[in-house]
């Protein structure tokens, strides 16, 4: 049994009410805050309002910052303590420690060098008291010596990086040498800071050595220069251009040794080179630091600049007229790239993107047009009006709808000046002009204006061109009375079909 029209209309109204209720839940009324909302969406880089709303919900519900997800930064004290431990290890061992892995106390990291010296460090760790050392002390010896690997001539992994750094410094531009090492000032404030640093190092350093009774009292000796360990057989020592001149003077070195501060670089290099057979060969380049250093930098700079070719001058693209060679297409392009793009998407792969809906069957030239079309088959409405919170499937529909609130009518008819908001309204209006022009078959011979009926033409003549109607009649025929002319004019205006005035007999008045 078929349902009655009343039941069908009732079900239709119920479905419409449910649809409106479901859509109203998705609307967000921003009121007067629409400008701030759009500005925030552009700053965060979201293309849809729903993405911004999802981001704000996630940020509100999350415990931490959404944008700053990741591990917490390490405290400066922890990093300073790590540098302190590494420096203390370098004073006693020339090998560079590497990360062995987690396993220290409180989940810290364990560092170990090739000689077996280990120490642990954690991000939250700091300097501890000497009673609780956190490092594995070195075995006590009667004489301070280097590790077996360094003695046997095996170069550790850390020294290879030093050689690479020196090679990179040799390739630097002329006059832009490596930055000199910064040494503490030798004034009273500098001496106090150095003494405090030595005390911290002695407290934090677990590597203690016991000297023999015949040796002199334990005086803090300066750490050996890495230059002496990086030298190999036949290798020339680098010029001490980075060592400041005041630090190379004997008076400054004597004052620094008396105050307990580490001595300058030259004081550390000379004693070790004195007993070797290569000392005489290596002290000669050290005596003249300016000539060889500048020549090495100059040669390296010339080699680098020679590899760089002349500046490339880019030529402008030629302007030419390239017509499309497909039959029936008269498009002309000024660039071959545009022509190839036109051929590919307008002729070769013409409408290769088809709609997946079986009942639709539409096809498009570009994939982006297909994506916009697929939205019409779904109920996805990502574009929301900022004035009334209505949602739309495409951005073009939102732009047209927004003109209702702004009052903008950018489209105008070129015939009568009619303005409208969307192209469909303008096309419908232009059809009226086309139909009207086809229906006006009777023109006026004086001004060219067209009318639908001949009666309208006669009325137009008598109203708009009365003088032009009288002039031909005076030149063509005999004398006529004024009353006959007026009578014929009124008769033509009333009947409409008679456009010419024939001569009539005079009317006799009683």
UniProtKB/Swiss-Prot annotation:
Composition-biased stretches (Low complexity): 237-265
Q: Where in the cell is it found?
A: Nucleus
Which residues fall in a compositionally biased region of kind Acidic residues?
A: 188-201
Residues with the Phosphoserine modification: 161, 225, 464
Q: Does the keyword Metal-binding apply?
A: yes
Q: Which PANTHER family match?
A: TRANSCRIPTIONAL REPRESSOR CTCFL-RELATED (PTHR24406)
Function of this protein?
A: May act as an transcriptional repressor for PCK1 gene expression, in turn may participate in the hepatic gluconeogenesis regulation through the activated AMPK signaling pathway.
Record-given protein name: Zinc finger protein 692
Q: Which organism is it from?
A: Bos taurus (Bovine)
UniProt lineage: Eukaryota, Metazoa, Chordata, Craniata, Vertebrata
State the gene name recorded for this protein. Answer: ZNF692
């Amino acid at each position: 049994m078929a349902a009655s029209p009343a039941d069908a209309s009732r079900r239709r109204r119920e479905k419409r009410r449910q649809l409106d209720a479901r859509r109203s839940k998705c609307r967000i009324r921003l009121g007067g805050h629409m400008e701030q909302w759009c500005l925030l969406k552009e700053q965060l880089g979201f293309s849809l309002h729903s993405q911004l709303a999802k981001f704000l919900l996630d940020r509100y519900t999350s415990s931490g910052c959404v944008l700053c997800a990741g591990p917490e930064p390490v405290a400066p004290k922890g990093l300073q303590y790590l540098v302190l431990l590494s420096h203390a290890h370098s004073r006693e061992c020339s090998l560079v420690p590497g990360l062995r892995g987690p396993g220290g106390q409180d989940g810290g990291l364990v560092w170990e060098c090739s000689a077996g010296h280990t120490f642990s460090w954690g991000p939250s760790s700091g300097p501890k008291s000497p009673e609780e050392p956190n490092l594995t002390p070195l075995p006590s010896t009667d004489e301070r010596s280097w590790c077996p690997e360094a003695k046997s001539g095996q170069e550790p992994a850390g020294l290879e990086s030093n050689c690479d750094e020196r090679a990179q410094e040799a390739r630097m531009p002329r006059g832009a040498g490596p930055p000199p090492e910064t040494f503490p000032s030798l004034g009273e404030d500098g001496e106090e800071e150095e003494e405090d640093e030595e005390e911290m190092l002695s407290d934090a350093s677990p590597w203690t050595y016991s000297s023999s009774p015949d040796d002199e009292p334990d005086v803090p000796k300066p750490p050996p220069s890495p230059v002496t360990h990086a030298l190999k057989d036949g290798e020339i020592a680098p010029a001490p251009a980075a060592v400041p001149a005041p630090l190379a003077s004997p008076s400054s070195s004597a004052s620094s040794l008396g105050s307990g501060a580490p001595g300058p670089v030259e004081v550390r290099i000379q004693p070790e080179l004195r007993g070797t057979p290569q000392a005489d060969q290596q002290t000669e380049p050290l005596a003249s630091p300016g000539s060889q250093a500048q020549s090495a930098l100059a040669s390296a700079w010339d080699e680098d600049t020679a590899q760089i070719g002349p500046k490339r001058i880019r030529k402008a693209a030629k302007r030419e007229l390239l017509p499309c060679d497909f039959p029936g297409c008269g498009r002309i392009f000024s660039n071959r790239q545009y022509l190839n793009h036109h051929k590919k998407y307008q002729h070769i792969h013409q409408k290769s993107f088809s709609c997946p809906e079986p009942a639709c069957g539409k096809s498009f030239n570009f994939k982006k047009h297909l994506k916009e079309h697929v939205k019409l088959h779904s109920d996805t409405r990502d574009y929301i009006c900022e004035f009334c919170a209505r949602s739309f499937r495409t951005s073009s529909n939102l732009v047209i709808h927004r003109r209702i609130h702004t009052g903008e009518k950018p489209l105008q008819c070129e015939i009568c000046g009619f303005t409208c908001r969307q192209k469909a309204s303008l096309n419908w209006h232009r059809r009226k002009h086309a139909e009207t022009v086809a229906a006006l078959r009777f023109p006026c011979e004086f001004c060219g204006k067209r009318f639908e009926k001949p009666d309208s033409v006669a009325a137009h003549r008598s109203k708009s061109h009365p003088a032009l109607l009288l002039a031909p009649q005076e030149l063509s025929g005999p004398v006529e009375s004024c009353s006959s002319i007026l009578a014929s004019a009124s008769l033509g205006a009333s009947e409409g079909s008679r456009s010419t005035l024939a001569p009539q007999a005079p009317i006799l008045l009683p």
